[in-house]
From Swiss-Prot:
Domain RRM: 428-506
Record-listed Phosphothreonine modification sites: 188
PTM (free text): Sumoylated by PIAS1 with SUMO1 and SUMO2/3, desumoylated by SENP1. Sumoylation is required for transcriptional repressor activity.
Keyword Disulfide bond: no
UniProt protein name: Scaffold attachment factor B1
Source organism per UniProt: Mus musculus (Mouse)
Omega-N-methylarginine found at: 832
Start and end residues of each SAP domain: 31-65
Annotated segments matching region Interaction with SAFB2: 621-937
PTM annotation (N6-acetyllysine): residues: 629
Region span, Interaction with POLR2A: 550-814
Amino acid sequence: MAETLSGLGDASAAGAAAVSSAASETGTRRLSDLRVIDLRAELKKRNLDSSGNKSVLMERLKKAIEDEGGNPDEIEVTSECNKKMPKRPSKGRKPEDEGVEDNGLEENSGDGQEDVETSLENLQDMDMMDISVLDEADIDNGSVADCVEEEEEATLPEGLADSTELVEGDLKGLPEQLQEHAIDDKDTVNNVDTSSSDFTMLQEMEEASLEPENEKILDILGETCKSEPVKEEGSELEQPFAQATSSVGPDRKLAEEEDLFESCGHPEEEEEEEEEDQEEEQEEEGDLALASSSKSESPSTRCQWSEADAPLAVVKREPADAPGGGTGMDREPVGLEEPVEQSSTAAQLPEATSQELVRAPTAALSPEPQDSKEDVKKFAFDACNDVPAPPKESSASEGADQKMSSVEEDSDTKRLSREEKGRSSCGRNFWVSGLSSTTRATDLKNLFSRYGKVVGAKVVTNARSPGARCYGFVTMSTAEEATKCISHLHKTELHGKMISVEKAKSEPTGKRVPDRRDGDSKKEKASTSDRSANLKREEKGERKDDAKKTDDGSTEKSKDADDQKPGPSERSRTTKSGSRGTERTVVMDKSKGVPVISVKTSGSKERASKSQDRKSASREKRSVVSFDKVKESRKSRDSESRRERERSEREQRLQAQWEREERERLEIARERLAFHRHRLERERMERERLERERMHVEQERRREQERIHREREELRRQQELRYEQERRPAVRRPYEVDGRRDDAYWPEAKRAALDDRYHSDFSRQDRFHDFDHRDRGRYPNHSVDRREGSRSMMGDREGQHYPERHGGPERHGRDSRDGWGYGSNKRLSEGRGLPPPPRRDWGEHGRRLEDDRAWQGTADGGMMERDHKRWQGGERSMSGHSGPGHMMNRGGMSGRGSFAPGGASRGHVIPRGGMQAGFGGQSRGSRPSDARFTRRY
């Protein structure tokens, strides 16, 4: 307890500032004082989600506590592991693992006792690959040395569960009295055994289906921590089979030979046979005591193979120094081999050994011991050359039989004692849960050493889940001491925490470090088991060395046969590295005098065979098959390979022919497709050509239709024009000749005279091009004629009134007749007796022409009708003015009668002037008014 208290003091000194109370005490704390790890532990205890930051966790926990009816300000928190654990980084544990271990160590800390039991159940179910060794105690006394090595071997890769039977063979191989000679290889042996035991436990936790096998293994591995030396597997397995097969007889051996040959490729059947052989071997344990007479020879053998093995089994440690270390130093450690070669089949070796040993007596009893066994050895590599050769073969050395039988008997006695110990070791291991974070492996060792010898103590945790609890795994020297510890220390207090001690369920001693990956663990598992197998094989080789100095001839012969085997190349290479005279041995049973077993003891060959997988077991059984069967199998194999070759060639030919035909078919199909493609292309081009022609014809037809349409439109337009032109004269009002003739003021003579004068020799066609000459005959311009007539009459009158200006009426009439030549004045003067019009000068005549031209420009369209109306109106108005005042009015109207009085006569000037302005412009006002009109009115 002093150590415990000191450890606790160190821990509290290092971490008191961080933790409010001792790490293992239960206290009431406020919710706000809890760390994230405490919050997560409380949430996990309530099966709530523990992810998120601190505020989320506090809110979640507070809600949960309020739902439970508790007070969030007073929470009972049990700290299980202190963050400030002053522990050294132990083997297999990195410094950063401490933090990982601390996280969550306070979870499940509600009520300690239930948590302890629950954690124990969880621990039994924990995946062994996840267990990390936090601390382990170094136990230095002699009987415990191997357990120290076993615990330090925790850093070795896991996975010797499959090779536990091999380890069993090693443990059973030598008698207990050799312990004093075997101290030198204790480290090696214990490394192999403890690792295998640990890995067995690991395998058990991972695969529940392997539990029966693991329980068997537990018996084997029980002695790991009792410093039981490794015993020879071959010898241990040989004796019971020797007795069994010697009593059976040759017939059964031949049947077993055939069974072996049939089961060449069936490793599963071989495993079953191996289990049956082990049961048989256990039944015959009682008879094995007979062999104890030859124990004296075994120590030297033990020493020599163990020394050869020392460099093999220790992976991370140097071999321990031991008192008997010098005994076998003159021997060469032929067991050394790369782990790759050893890695896969070590677990097969016990099965292989047992089954091969069952069949071996047949070869030993055969009438031609040497040749047949060499052939058997050849068969082991020829008949099944697809798998590595067996590590054991029969030998024809009769001289070595006596010596080897004693070794065999020794190994059987050792196996018996070791099995008893293994059965007693089932209950030596127990778990300790509920540990404080300050508890170290030395504390556990000191605590449990009160009730017995502590073989191993470790503090482990689940490395895969951060913040997992810490557990202790303790191995006592005997099951009784373990039971005593459990009864005395279960539900007791350690470092302020209630610990629970419970027996490990069918688990061998020690936990594993899960730091390595599964692949590495499997590889290393196989390699460690291979090393233990190497120890056994080398021991046999060395024993053969001593026993068989005279057997060189047969040995050379067998080695030649070995060299021409079809096994792997490294097998023959390693075979030569061993001693050349120790290839095979025939072991004789002295009590019965019959050859019991044939052992192939070339260490290098054994090593090479270990590089294969489980199938190597079947090869060991095949070592007793006769040479005839070898030849037979070779012939059948050759014929089968020949048949296979012919079949493959035939298939290739058929395939080639089929491919050729397929190519031809494809070519024909391609040509047909190309032809179709060309035909379709031609048809498409023809269709396109026809389409183009059709489009062209369509365009032509459309153009023709448009042309016809245009012509039709043109014709229609012309017809409409003609119709319009024909219709236009009917719309215009023609000149009413009769109506004008009826007019009192415009007699017929005047109209005719005007008409004749208009159409006289004075040609006006060239002057007025805007007139339509066709229509002139229809409605002549009477306005012009009228104006002309009026002017002529006015001129006549002016000539009468102003003879001094005009020169008399005669001269004026003559001039007007000569100058104008219209004949109208003559007719007028003839018809009415009017005097001839006054003579006009050419200036006035030019003015009149100008006026006429201007009037003609405005006379188109309906103007003529309006002019006719106005002329008629004017004439009528003029005709209405009778009386003498009219002369003056007209004179004044023409602009010349300035002497006429204004007065009422002005009203008559306005229409006349307006009429003149409408037709002639302003120049008309200067024309002289004809004075002759006065006589008419």
